Each structure stands twice: as C-alpha cells, then as structure tokens.
Amino acid sequence: MEHTYQYAWIIPLLPLPVTMSIGFGLLLIPTATKSIRRMWAFPSVLLLSIGLIFSANLAFQQINGSFIYQYLWSWTINNDFSLEFGYFIDPLTSVMLILITTVGIMVLIYSDNYMSHDQGYLRFFAYMSFFNASMLGLVTSSNLIQIYIFWELVGMCSYLLIGFWFTRPSAASACQKAFITNRVGDFGLLLGILGFYWITGSFEFRDLFETFNKLNNEGNSLFPTLCAFLLFLGAIAKSAQFPLHVWLPDAMEGPTPISALIHAATMVAAGIFLVARLLPLFTGIPYIMNIISLIGVITLLLGATLALAQRDIKRSLAYSTMSQLGYIMLALGLGSYRAALFHLITHAYSKALLFLGSGSIIHSMEPLVGYSPDKSQNMVLMGGLTRYIPITRTTFLLGTLSLCGIPPLACFWSKDEILSESWLYSPSFAVIAYFTAGLTAFYMFRVYLLTFEGSLHVNFQNYSGTQNTSAYSISLWGKEEPKSVNSLFSTMKTNNETKNILFFEKNIYQFNENVINQMRDFTTPFLRKNTSMYPHESDNTMLYPLLILVVFTLFVGFIGIPLVQGEGEIDLNLLSKWLAPSKNLLYPNSEDSIDLYDFFINASFSVSIATGGIFLAFIFYGSPYSPLQNLDLMNLLVKIGTKTKRVSLDKIANIVYNWSHNRGYIDIFYTNVVTQSIRELAKLTQFFDRYIIDGITNSVGVLSFFAGEAIKYLVGGGRISFYLFFYLFFILIFVYFLFLSL
C-alpha cells in the first residue's frame, strides 16, 4: 500500500509526454510529425489508461483507509516562509482521478475519429493531453498554492480548446468571454488564498483547517467570511454558477468532444471540487454555507428555465450542466458531502454520454446541412433520426432518462438523495429543487423528441427566410465557404408537426395541405434509401465510447444505494464505506442508509414529477403520429378553458421563449449596463489623465518657458546661464519665505 502511494505523483505527469512530443515534433520535424498524426491518439489513450490503473488502485485502498499527505519538494525563501509541494490522496481525490481518467479515455478514443479530418488534429490532442495533466495535478494538490497553479493551467487549456477554431469570430469571442468571466473568479480566489494565509500562516489544507478552527472560536468572523466568499467566487466562475455562468453556453463553440470532457465531467467540476475540498473550512462560517446553498438553488432553477426554448442541441446540454451543477452546489451548501459527491459521479458519466451523443448527431447532420454550427446543431432542422442512427438514439435516450431521474439509472439515486436532504434544510429550497426536477425532464425530452422523433425537418427556405437553398460550410480552420445542398432535403412537415417543433418559437410556418400530400408521396421512397446524402450512423470508434458510457450510466448509481436490508444484514451503501471517515456535515450523527419503505416514499414523489415533465414534453413535442397526439390534449384544454385563458397561455409561452432566447436578460444586462459603465469610466479616466494630469504637467512647462522668455526680454540679452541662475535664485527666495510663513 505504501509502495503504491509512493508513486502516486506519477499520475499527473503521465499525459505530458504526448504534449511535449507533439510540440517538439511540430517545431523540429513538422512534416514527419504530421505524416503520422493519427498514431498520436494511441500513446494518448495508453498513458491515460495507465493513469486509470493507478487511480483505481488508490481508490480501492481508500476504502476504510486513511488520508495520505506526501511532500516531494520544498521551496524555502527564508526561515519564516516556505512552500511545500506534494500530493494529497483521500476519497475525494480518488473520485476525481477516476472520473478524469475514465471520461478522458473515452473522449480521446472518440476524438480520433471525430477530429480525423481536421487540420488541427495534432494541436487538439496536445491541448487535451495537457488539460488532463493539469486537471490530475489540480485534484492531487496538497495546498492552496498548488491548486491555484493548476487552476490557471486548466483554465488556459480551456481557453485554447474553446477557441480551437480561432478564425471563426464566434469562437474567438467565446474564448475571450470565458477568459474575462473566469478572471473575475480567479482574482477572487487569489485574494481569498492570500487572506487565509494572513489569518492562519499556512497554505496546507491540514494546517489550514486546524488553525482556523482554533481561531474561529475567538470570534471576529467578518474578515474570514470575506476571504471564504472570495474563495467561493473562484468556484462560482469555474463551475458556471450564477451570476458568472454566462461563459458556458458560448463555450460550446469548441469541438464537441471537449464539451464532454471539460464542460461536463471535469473542468466545470473543478469549482465543485474546490468547495468540497474546503468544506471543513466553510462549515465553520455559517453565512458562507447559506450563500453556497442559495447560489446553488438559484443556478439550478435558472439553468433549467434557460434550457426550455434553446434551438442549439449543445447549448441545451450546457444549460442542463449548469442546472445539475447547481444541484451539487446546493448539496454542498446543505453540508451533504456524500450526496454532492454522488451526484458529481453520476452526472459526469451521464452528461459525457449526452455530449458525445450530440457529437454523433451533429456528425450525421453535417453531410446534409454543411459544417455550419447554426445548422448542424439546430434541433429545428433535425427530427426522425431514429431510423438513421439507432445506436446513437438508444444511448442518447438512456442518458436522457438518467438525467431526468428515472430509476434504475444513475442520476436517479443521487438526485433523489439531494432532494431528500433539501427537505431537512429548507422546505422552500426543496420546492424549487423538485420543481426544477420536473423542468429537467421536460427540456431533456424536448431535446430528445425534436432530434429523434417525427420526420426529418431540413427546410432551408423556411428556416433562413431566403429563397436560395445554399448552406455555409465551415472549413477546417473556420473560414466560411459556400456549399450547395441538394434541394431534395427540403422535407415538408405537417401543420401539427411544425407547431410541435417550434413551440416557444416566434415564427410558425404554414404549408398548403395539398402541396404537402403531393410532396409526401414523392419524398417517402427516397427517405428509405440508405445513401450517403442522408444521416448515417457514426463509425465504431465513435460508438464504442458511447456504449461504454452507457454501462457506467446504468450501473454506477448502484454504488450509493442508501438502503439497508435489515438488522444484521449487508448494507448496500458502498459509497459511504468508500468515503469513510468523511461524514455528512449537516447531521453528523445521522445514518447514511435509510429504510426501504422510507426510500420508496421519497423516490416515488420525485419520479412522479419527472414523469409529469416527460408527459408534457410528449404533448408539446411528440410525433404527430403518437397516441398522445391523437388524443389532441391541447385542443381539449382550449375547449375546456375560455378564450382569455388561451390568450394567457400564449402570453406565458411568449414570456418563456423570450426569457430563454435572451438568456434571462443577464447577458444583455452585462453588455448594456456593466460593460458600458466600465467603458464610460475608462473614457472618464482617459479624459482625466489626458486633460488634467497631463495638463498640469504641460502647464508647468509652458509657464516656465514664458517666464524665461519674459526674463530674457526684461534683461535685454546676455548669456543664457545668467538668466537661468537669476530665475532660480528668485524661485529659491520665494520658497524660503513660503516655508517661513508656515
């Protein structure tokens, strides 16, 4: 056991050789390096697999084990200040190591095919390997300084990958937005680290917790509360929590595989990791725990409402990620360490599955609509993909059901535990959390139904509002190029189906029924042909990671089933044994396992809410040929209600659309108020600097010049040195008498 821990420092270093080899290869022998570029995927996967083996070994040894501090190197500046670098292994570290390596391996295998035709293939794998190394270094850090160093490296890799196609203006803008937003959080994190060092005199976690608990008993908690909030500010930005969440949807401009790794399973979880790591510190400051839970509940509701009317499939999943991270943050604010960590595990695998599934969907749509994200990621142009990509559809459906909280899939067990814990803390928070669970089921099945049910909705004329049928493809370096598209794929839709697709949308396009019937007979035979011009299933190297993540989605939830079979029998709660001696900080004396009857009572309520959300999604977005559509429930509701109620329903739908389409008006507020105010302040500062500061300086010079000229004129000639001496003499006399008067 000690022998394994002794070499744990190797884990963060394993991905680095790939990054360094690609970098030196492109610098020294670029032609040879590019000629064997597809071979670089193998060492990337191999080295990360070795890291997975080490991580799994450490995780098994952590069951009922103790924490391990190991110092590798010390930098001593003087006798009073030194920095010690090493690694810290505990259950939280083990969880994150396994998450990063497993999801990272799946993403690297997937990316080999997804990025195979991209000119930046080598650059992509270099960035990904460096990100994996930075993230592994972050979670094994033994002190706050180490965390901050790797925190910045993780952020740098994120910016590089978000702006991977840097010639596209939208990608460059998204990269800048992510950088600026995270600068706010990172600056707060740095100030918080320095503040706690000033309080405790140490950066080490163990010393920090012990010293702060002793000092906390003496009172005067204002400054520690401020420092703790600054630390939490870093987590708010990195984990896309309100109000610093605005960068995450724009980050979808990067390649889809990075969304699965960085913006679902790992980097956005870095903020969660930081709060979980510092939770013993935060629990001594009640105000901070209240703030954490409040930010979490606001974020989970906001993310769900913003996802209700999104057209872009990746942005819908991004807002879903934001909402689910809000659930985890709420659990941490409640002090429910185990529930938060459990949902972190289950959500990471389910959301990675969904993001990789969305990449497979986009990959299948690109031959039809071109390589423009506005079209290939637009759910309005999808539909009926079940018959073309059945494997992707099955995996995406399982990931959707898991995120909705449907048993026995993974997210059901963890989300239900958070919902139960929220009742113990605040019924009002619990009501919001349960309501958001219903919204989650609604918008996730909205994504699924718009993508896979019905028929193919590719219709460029009606979508773009133009008369031509040309699309725009984005080249491998982001340059837009015109690309002709076969007009055969302007598939007609029935009126009922069109309404379902564009619910919460501004414009609903109507078609003549006679034209629709004529075109349907013409297009149906062609739709049954398996040609390259129709959506097609992805290659095996993209499907294998999906199938493996399905296995995790199906079974990873069973490690935390909070059930006990009876007195003296086996406790099924393996996660609690793994996390021992970590305790639930909300109620330390409570048991982690609950009775079977109580569990089913709690679970039935959450499952009922999720089922209701799915039912509503089928009503609004289901196929026009489904049994629910035959019931015509919408018209039934209109007949039962009055015309006034119908108008009110339309107004509500319009409000929901505007709220979601405008991102809750938060981006508009930042642009029109915050950004504009900063610009006006900058202009005022520039005016003050140019006309006041520079004016005073220039005025002194001008006055000196005219004074010299006046003296020269009065004296009537002579050597210039005499004039200067005469001038300075009177200045000194004036200053002397001025000081005497004071």
From Swiss-Prot:
Q: Which GO terms describe its biological process?
A: ATP synthesis coupled electron transport; electron transport coupled proton transport
Q: Could you tell me what this protein does?
A: NDH shuttles electrons from NAD(P)H:plastoquinone, via FMN and iron-sulfur (Fe-S) centers, to quinones in the photosynthetic chain and possibly in a chloroplast respiratory chain. The immediate electron acceptor for the enzyme in this species is believed to be plastoquinone. Couples the redox reaction to proton translocation, and thus conserves the redox energy in a proton gradient.
Where are the bilayer-spanning segments?
Answer: 9-29, 40-60, 89-109, 125-145, 147-167, 185-205, 228-248, 256-276, 288-308, 325-345, 352-372, 394-414, 423-443, 544-564, 599-619, 720-740
Instruction: List GO molecular-function terms, semicolon-separated.
Output: NADH dehydrogenase (ubiquinone) activity; quinone binding
Q: Which gene encodes it?
A: ndhF
Subunit note: NDH is composed of at least 16 different subunits, 5 of which are encoded in the nucleus.
Q: Name one GO cellular component term.
A: chloroplast thylakoid membrane
Entry EC no(s):
7.1.1.-
Membership in a protein family: Belongs to the complex I subunit 5 family.
Top-rank taxon of the source lineage equals Eukaryota
Major place of localization? plastid
The UniProt catalytic activity note for this protein reads: a plastoquinone + NADH + (n+1) H(+)(in) = a plastoquinol + NAD(+) + n H(+)(out); a plastoquinone + NADPH + (n+1) H(+)(in) = a plastoquinol + NADP(+) + n H(+)(out)
Q: Where can this protein be found?
A: Plastid, Chloroplast thylakoid membrane
**Which keywords appear in this protein's UniProt record, sorted alphabetically?**
Chloroplast, Membrane, NAD, NADP, Plastid, Plastoquinone, Quinone, Thylakoid, Translocase, Transmembrane, Transmembrane helix, Transport
Report how it sits in the membrane. Multi-pass membrane protein
Which protein is depicted? NAD(P)H-quinone oxidoreductase subunit 5, chloroplastic
